[in-house]
Amino acid sequence: YSLVFILGLPGNAIALYYLSQRKQRARSTNVYFLNLSVVDTVFICLLPFRIYYHNTGNNWVFGDIACRITGGLFYGNIYLSIGFFTCISLDRYLAVVHPLTYRRLRFSHYPLVLTILIWMICGAIVLPLIFGGPLNNILEANRTSCFEEFSPRSWHNRLVPYNVCALIFGFLVPFTVIAIVFPLMARKIGKIRKSIHRTVALRIIGFILTVSLICFLPYNITHLFHFLMRLQFIQKCSSSIIIYKLRRITLALISLNSCLNPLLYFIPSQSWENNILLFICFQNEQCRYCKCCTIFFNTATNS
């Protein structure tokens, strides 16, 4: 967490300024980038609370309200990040596989609608948990935990619905979408002659896939086993200890995405879809969009 805070704060501050100053702020990709950068910046600014919590032997001293706010934002960052990764993947999929449709949609209201939908889904997952009651628990040795070590009653009454929704919308749906669109994108990109545009496209694909596999997948798999353990499907004491330790490690690992994401924002991503559209049109002599391609080519050349 300390490493993420040291590296992530200046990186996200620079990225946030860069994204807010870009001329194409209304473009779909930039809308998702900007939201992702805001989420990461807020998340990193709250990391000192978690750092202090772990350095004092997992003893929360900031009170219940601070526990709810920081805990809710911490876990909300997980779902918002993977949600906007999914939006970026869909955006790149449209740009690669359906470029003409993409050009009609990228300046329309659909990026804003998707962004609002992601925030609403995250709020529907996290807010009931935050407002459902205290999230700090006084344990032995006068130690207070935050967002962990809940009683069996709290787990069944409050955390089962939360975890089911988190696993569906924070894991199954996003990873299914990413797993489907990436092969389709890679197949289409493979048909394009080697150029800087192809390189940029592959970098975007590779970055999102790498961060998803390194940061998000281990946590969600561990979270699934932790969920099964709390429902007593896994009862062996040795297995429970391993799952608990792995969950701590993967929670720290998932925070790495907040200091890695600024690298994504600076990948040149403005013009490579032009090459894809021109390739699709000019490869087909009977292309019914020839007039559209000619206009688009002239526009791209002049710009």
Show the residue positions of the predicted features.
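Loop architecture of class A 7-transmembrane GPCRs
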Residues: 54-79, 98, 103-104, 109-115, ...
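Hydrophobic alpha-helical segments of membrane proteins
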Residues: 45, 124-131, 172-179, 209-228, ...
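Intrinsically disordered regulatory tails of 7TM GPCRs
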Residues: 138-139, 143, 233-237, 270-303
